[in-house]
Amino acid sequence: MKEKTFICILALCCLLGGCGAAHKAPTGNPPFREGRQLTVWSAYWDCQESVTVIDRCTDRISAVSLFAAYFRDGALFLPEETQETLRALRRSDAGDPKPIYLSVVNDVTEGEKTIQKDTEILRSVLSPHQAEGHARELVALAKEYGFDGIEIDYEKLREDPDLWEQFLSFEEILLSLAQEAGLKVRIILEPGIPVKTLSFPQGAAYVVMCYNLHGIGTEPGPKADLAFLRALYDRFAGLPNLSFALANGGFDWEEASGKAVSLTEKDAAALAEAHQVLPRRDAASGALSFSYTQDSTRHTVWYADSETLALWAAELDACAGKTVPISIWRVD
């Protein structure tokens, strides 16, 4: 565990431009720029390691988003692990406090059953007669536990005009209540939404997910490539207070079935080492890939490392003509 944590700290600090002379990022890897606004996600299942990494790289991190509150048996639920991460971060950053957001997702758990990205719960809580109550509940939850902001990560709205109308009305209410309570608001946006037909209000930070070019249900490939990033920037450039979310790690595709399994960067590197293969860096994306055979079945792996993320961030900077805010999924 100690070795794993050290590797994670070193990789993130290199990514953020915080490596000392003894631990420089690879040659040609543009570090994340000084002065970049950088938010990192911490997931509730990685509490202890996340706190260690964030604490070691605290001077490079602008904000933290704790993933996540969700719906359990019809009510908002905040995992104890998320609460403990918040307490630990507050203890460690007492001399340098940074905003900590409560991330809220539309995952639903009922008994032993879990539905991820459930749109039915959204149709309920965003409906005209429940939207204000839902917004008040979110603000109360964030204030109760001492968060500095609320992050709305409601997904799979896709091109449903009625659901988007409800969401935007809810957002207006949330922004008003959050402002009264002294809370910040971040809105996470999937890359495929019909952004050109939607009128998002001022007051929130808008974060575009830039990491689902390939994944579960697709052919093997990187989470993003440079052309994908340029296209996303062009589509979303008109939004106010815009930033971009990048993700490390990747997927392992089983060629016979097409099934994909998510991998962290460390998992992918360990898999390559175990099968004695050397990953190759793709020029179009900066991502790493390799293939291996196990139990007579061919597998293909694509994943992003710190050099990949730095390249993606630099491409977005070039599109914007400035250093853009970046969020990273996730500290692992």
What residue spans do the PLM features occupy?
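Catalytic domains of carbohydrate-active enzymes, especially glycoside hydrolases
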Residues: 48-74, 138-150, 312-327
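Hydrophobic faces of well-ordered beta-strands that scaffold small-molecule active sites
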Residues: 38-42, 62-66, 100-104, 150-152, ...
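Substrate-binding surface in catalytic domains of secreted glycosidases
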Residues: 41-43, 73-81, 160, 164-274
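C-terminal motif of bacterial Sec signal peptides marking the signal peptidase cleavage site
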Residues: 16-18
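An active-site-proximal structural segment forming one wall of the substrate-binding cleft
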Residues: 123-150, 177, 190-192, 196-199
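Glycan-recognition patch characteristic of GH18 chitinases/ENGases
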Residues: 23-134
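Active-site groove signature of glycoside hydrolases
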Residues: 134-165, 206-212
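Glycan-binding loop/region signatures in secreted carbohydrate-active enzymes
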Residues: 109-121, 248-312
